[in-house]
């Protein structure tokens, strides 16, 4: 067994002097592999008397276990050292300025919708939505728009067939709401609408927001006050506002609203009026008991006026140089 003691001493010395994991792998093969020293010792047990084999085999296994434990401990220590060295080389100096994260932002049209909805929501109006593919009843008939009205023509409206179309206004939301809700009613209805038009100030798809207020004794004075307050809050300045008599089939009386800009010119911003009695009758509301007013505004137009944008098409071109200005 003197040879076994020398072998263990040799293994331990080789392990202690190893400087990397690769050297340990070589030692593992040399001492513990299929042709390694410990394997040969176990194979040599057949050459000794049978009665001595258990004791000798036990000593060989004990010696092998000592050497194996030493190798495992050394390997773990070297791996930890290598890992620490690698981490030290790859460490990040947290005092250095980092890379600036690119943040997204809301589209200017979305910003305007949020501003308008927030203003009226604070006054008790609830948001209402409706389908963009609409029937001619909700888009025209129920709104007191006669069959010969030019808005029904193909050059103004996208028709699917004789009765279905892409809505040209969000007014259908008002009809659907009045059919299912008892007065008093206060809704704000934002959404996409479609008209067959495309130039510097018109696009085939644009956004519209409509208001509807139905209650007993609703009147034009309330409507004017509401619009004054809204325009002052939206443009964040004390604007001159004027109401011009106009005509809409679904309101009577009707008006278009202009604001005085800094260049001294009047600019139209929205349309409004008292809900026509025929519209109330179409949804089963008694116009002798209830009255109401409606407001309609183009979101892109409001956005253009607020941010001094001259070409409506810029909102749909997805040019980041343009969109980044609204963050």
UniProtKB/Swiss-Prot annotation:
One of its GO terms (biological process) is phenylalanyl-tRNA aminoacylation. Its main location: cytoplasm. Its EC number is 6.1.1.20. Binds 2 magnesium ions per tetramer. Keywords: Aminoacyl-tRNA synthetase, ATP-binding, Cytoplasm, Ligase, Magnesium, Metal-binding, Nucleotide-binding, Protein biosynthesis. PROSITE patterns: AA_TRNA_LIGASE_II. Signal peptide: none annotated. GO terms for molecular function: ATP binding; magnesium ion binding; phenylalanine-tRNA ligase activity; tRNA binding. InterPro entries: aa-tRNA-synth_II, aa-tRNA-synth_II/BPL/LPL, Phe-tRNA-synth_IIc_asu, Phe-tRNA_ligase_II_N, Phe_tRNA_ligase_alpha1_bac, Phenylalanyl-tRNA_Synthase, tRNA-bd_arm. Transmembrane segments: none annotated. It catalyses: tRNA(Phe) + L-phenylalanine + ATP = L-phenylalanyl-tRNA(Phe) + AMP + diphosphate + H(+). It is an enzyme of class 6 (ligase). It is found in: Cytoplasm. The keyword Magnesium applies. Pfam families: Phe_tRNA-synt_N, tRNA-synt_2d. It comes from the Bacteria. GO terms for cellular component: cytoplasm. Mg(2+) binds at residue 252. Tetramer of two alpha and two beta subunits. This is Phenylalanine--tRNA ligase alpha subunit. It comes from Haemophilus ducreyi (strain 35000HP / ATCC 700724).
